[in-house]
From Swiss-Prot:
Keywords: Antiviral defense, Endonuclease, Hydrolase, Magnesium, Metal-binding, Nuclease. Mg(2+) binds at residue 40. CDD domains: Cas2_I_II_III. This is CRISPR-associated endoribonuclease Cas2 4. GO terms for molecular function: metal ion binding; RNA endonuclease activity. One of its GO terms (biological process) is defense response to virus. It comes from Rhodospirillum rubrum (strain ATCC 11170 / ATH 1.1.1 / DSM 467 / LMG 4362 / NCIMB 8255 / S1). It is an enzyme of class 3 (hydrolase).
């Protein structure tokens, strides 16, 4: 069994952050966590599908690197979607959580991509 098929999977639980929020931004009742995701996909078709999936959750910052700002439930759904798209024997996706402190200390040089920001909507 691979990790994304495990129904009891606790992927979003981090032993270093028992609260699981990495000092997260709060949007409504859901804390939003930032992740950097990079991939090395052998097959062109699979690579395109992975890029489209990640593009629906965040912003491309380099050819095979994305930043996403998602809640735990969305992160779990995204990981399951990505897992279904790759060949676990030849492809690799790495997901790095970014705590609020680390993200605030980030330095970008050259052409940069705006950090994804989710602001609450006010409907009148």
């Amino acid at each position: 069994m691979v990790w994304w098929d495990d129904p009891d999977d606790a992927f979003c639980e981090d032993p270093f952050d028992p609260e699981g929020d990495y000092g997260a931004l709060q949007v409504g009742k859901q804390p939003m966590n930032r992740y950097v995701i990079c991939y090395d996909i052998v097959d062109d078709k699979r690579r395109l599908k992975v890029a489209k999936c990640l593009d629906s959750y965040g912003s491309r910052v380099q050819f095979s690197v994305f930043e996403v700002l998602v809640s735990k439930p969305l992160m779990t759904r995204m990981v399951r979607e990505l897992g279904a798209l790759i060949n676990a024997k030849t492809d690799r996706i790495s997901i790095y959580p970014q705590c609020a402190t680390c993200d605030a200390r980030r330095t970008d040089l050259g052409a940069t991509v705006e950090k994804p920001v989710h602001e609450p909507w006010i409907i009148v």
